[in-house]
Design a protein with these regions (language model features):
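Conserved ABC ATPase "signature" region
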Residues: 77, 127-146, 198, 255-256
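Conserved ABC ATPase signature
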Residues: 150-155, 159
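Conserved ABC transporter NBD signature motif
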Residues: 66-77
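A short, proline-enriched helix->beta-strand linker immediately N-terminal to the Walker B motif
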Residues: 170-174
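Short catalytic/signature loops enriched in Gly
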Residues: 4, 142-148, 236-324
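P-loop NTP-binding/switch modules centered on Walker-like glycine-rich loops
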Residues: 43, 177, 181, 185-266
Length: 324
């Protein structure tokens, strides 16, 4: 039985298409403790969002399905429970903030109706208006009663994102997964949403998994971070340790490619190439076609995960440059 709030072990989520099998998530391990913020960072197409969908049981099926691994929540394997029990956990115990509010908010239904559906599903119809207004107040929406009676198209992008956050927090879940919650917003609003998430997490004492390609966002909001590439985790450490002392060449490349006002005179570093086709992933280390440190063994064998830190302060890396 897991000692963590959430523990994902060797998770594999594949998509079976007419052209072949897509290894979207291919042996992922990570954990989240109570009252902790954990980041998952990587380029688009690395499997971050599909990892989140796997955890909350929303993998599009067909063509996708979880083909291996375990997802322990409070010691119970979510991959083995029936759909009706998973629906009771989703939203009430584990909630998700999606990245595009206009995709996940119905434009022709009032805000209070959309938030009220979640309450009705888990708690019945009692005190819906009070609960909706309280949730909107929690995310600092001005005039919450007016907003509750309005429609999504009447709100700005930042306000719509606040509504999605309110929807996720409506039933006071123990774990919230935020999937690129600031992607569609301008920089000023991004900062406001990030600060809001940090404040609310402390107020309601919930754990957070923050998925992003933005290294600055992860550094600002998280305690630990996992680096994901081509369906696998390649590095894991406390945020400060990873940013100050990256081990995997992919992590190093991500950090060097991030813009910094302190280094505006230098040429911007890039990672050459692109994320591989997960229908036919590279042999050995999946980063080897793009890696400046590539050795023959990197092409031949998948590197094991090695802890270069301690049990209390792990710094795990999967790279043949490190042999323990």
């Amino acid at each position: 039985m897991s000692e963590h709030l959430l523990s994902v072990e060797d998770l594999k989520t594949y998509f079976f298409t007419s052209r072949g099998v897509v290894h979207a998530v291919d042996g992922v391990d990570f954990y989240v403790d109570e009252d902790e913020a954990v980041g998952i960072v990587g380029e688009s197409g690395c499997g971050k969002s599909m990892t989140a969908f796997s955890v909350i049981g929303l993998v599009p099926s067909p063509p996708g399905r979880i083909v291996g691994g375990k997802i322990f929540y409070l010691g119970n394997d979510l991959t083995k429970i029936p759909d009706d029990k998973m629906r009771k956990i989703r939203g009430k115990e584990i909630a998700m903030i999606f990245q595009d509010p206009m995709t996940y908010l119905n434009p022709v239904l009032r805000i209070k109706h959309q938030l009220g559906e979640a309450i009705t599903l888990h708690q019945g119809k009692k005190n819906i208006d009070v609960a909706v207004q309280s949730a909107l107040e929690l995310v600092r929406i001005p005039s919450p009663r007016r907003v509750a009676n309005g429609y999504p198209y009447e709100l700005s992008g930042g306000m719509r994102q606040r509504v999605l956050i309110a929807l996720a927090l409506l039933l006071h879940p123990r774990l919230v997964i935020a999937d690129e919650p600031t992607t569609a917003l301008d920089v000023t609003v991004q900062a406001q949403i990030l600060e809001l998430l940090k404040q609310i997490r402390l107020e309601v004492k919930t754990s957070l998994v923050l998925i992003s390609h933005d290294l600055g966002l992860i550094a600002e909001a998280c305690d630990r971070v996992y680096v994901m590439y081509a369906g696998v985790m390649v590095e894991h450490a406390e945020v400060i340790d990873l940013y100050e002392n990256p081990k995997h060449p992919y992590t190093t490349g991500l950090l060097k490619s991030a813009l910094s006002i302190d280094e505006f005179k230098e040429d911007l570093s890039i990672i050459h190439g692109s994320v591989p086709n997960l229908m036919n992933p590279p042999s050995g280390c999946r980063f080897h076609p793009r890696c400046p440190e590539c050795m023959p063994i990197c092409i031949e064998k998948l590197p094991p995960r090695i802890n270069l830190g301690s049990d209390d302060k792990p710094h795990e890396v999967s790279c043949w440059l490190f042999k323990g």
